[in-house]
């Protein structure tokens, strides 16, 4: 009854903002900016930055809105997501779909007209990968959903790079590899904390299918791997000592959280690990940017 009543209420503009998952998109756009500046020997045109961020941001918002739409039944079961606009009934399925299509087309148009076709194509593939392949299939099909689907979420720095150069580059793929390796421990920590909700929603996250302790072990192993991968920019002379120091400090700190999580039964530690993983990625890319210019 509550959902039916909510559906009759006027839609607030903030509901549409929420559909775009702004906090997730902002973190993603940070990696886009870093990708752009790392690709440039000097400074990047503010005009190019503006159109790139706006275009990719709109497409990311479109993918997020489709995620809200497809996952509305799952979201209504989970405490963390039950009050999302579509799940709660504040935004109808039709409204969410039209919103996603419109801003997605706007974003792609901006990229084609003012950035370059390669970036537009890669952004479109990323949108389909996240909204279609991951949300529409992988999330419900396999416990490795975020490992496979994480490739779409790891693409933003590559998009920023191609926006500047108009071509693919091995160094840009290294940035993708960092985020790709970061994704499993990030999401699995949340999945441990929200274990019961994922179980009730019948989503085959790793803690649900293989147990919490097995998931903790995988978080530990992936965090070790992430520490190694994060040092590769220095190894290939893509970055210098400032980045190396930052990557080591952040990586060791992340490993401390993974170690603590492995040896405790307190759910709050899983959430603390999840939150630190966000800070880790943000600061790691800031170190990349600072190191590039200093």
UniProtKB/Swiss-Prot annotation:
Top-level EC class as recorded in UniProt: transferase
Claim: Ubl conjugation is one of the keywords in the record: no
Subcellular location: Cell inner membrane
Example of a GO biological process term: heme O biosynthetic process
Membrane-protein topology: Multi-pass membrane protein
Transmembrane segments: 24-44, 48-68, 96-116, 118-138, 146-166, 172-192, 224-244, 245-265, 268-288
Reactions accelerated catalytically: heme b + (2E,6E)-farnesyl diphosphate + H2O = Fe(II)-heme o + diphosphate
PROSITE patterns: UBIA (PS00943)
Job description of the protein: Converts heme B (protoheme IX) to heme O by substitution of the vinyl group on carbon 2 of heme B porphyrin ring with a hydroxyethyl farnesyl side group.
UniProt similarity note: Belongs to the UbiA prenyltransferase family. Protoheme IX farnesyltransferase subfamily.
HAMAP family the UniProt entry points to: CyoE_CtaB
Identification of the protein by name: Protoheme IX farnesyltransferase
Organism: Legionella pneumophila (strain Paris)
Gene: cyoE
């Amino acid at each position: 009854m509550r959902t039916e009543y909510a559906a009759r209420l006027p839609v607030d503009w903030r509901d549409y903002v929420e559909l775009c998952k702004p906090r997730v998109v902002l973190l993603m756009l940070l990696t886009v900016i870093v990708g752009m500046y790392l690709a440039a020997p000097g400074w990047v045109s503010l005009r190019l930055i503006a159109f790139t961020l706006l275009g990719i941001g709109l497409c990311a918002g479109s993918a997020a809105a489709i995620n809200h739409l497809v996952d509305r039944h799952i979201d209504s079961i989970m405490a963390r997501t039950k009050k999302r606009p579509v799940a709660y009934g504040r935004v109808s399925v039709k409204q969410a779909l039209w919103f996603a299509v419109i801003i997605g087309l706007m974003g792609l148009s901006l990229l084609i007209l003012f950035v370059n076709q390669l970036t537009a194509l890669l952004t479109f593939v990323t949108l389909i990968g996240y909204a279609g392949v991951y949300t529409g299939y992988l999330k419900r099909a396999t416990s490795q959903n975020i490992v496979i689907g994480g490739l779409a979420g790891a693409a933003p720095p590559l998009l920023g790079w191609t926006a500047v150069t108009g071509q693919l580059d091995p160094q840009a793929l290294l940035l993708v590899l960092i985020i790709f390796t970061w994704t499993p421990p990030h999401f699995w920590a949340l999945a441990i904390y929200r274990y019961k909700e994922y179980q009730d929603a019948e989503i085959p996250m790793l803690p649900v299918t293989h147990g919490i302790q097995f998931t903790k072990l995988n978080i530990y192993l992936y965090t070790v791997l992430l520490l190694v991968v994060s040092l590769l920019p220095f190894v290939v002379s893509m970055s210098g000592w400032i980045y190396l120091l930052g990557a080591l400090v952040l990586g060791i700190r992340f490993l401390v959280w993974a170690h603590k999580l492995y040896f405790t039964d307190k759910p709050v530690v899983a959430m603390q690990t999840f939150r630190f993983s966000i800070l880790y990625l943000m600061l790691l890319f800031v170190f990349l940017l600072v190191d590039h210019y200093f």
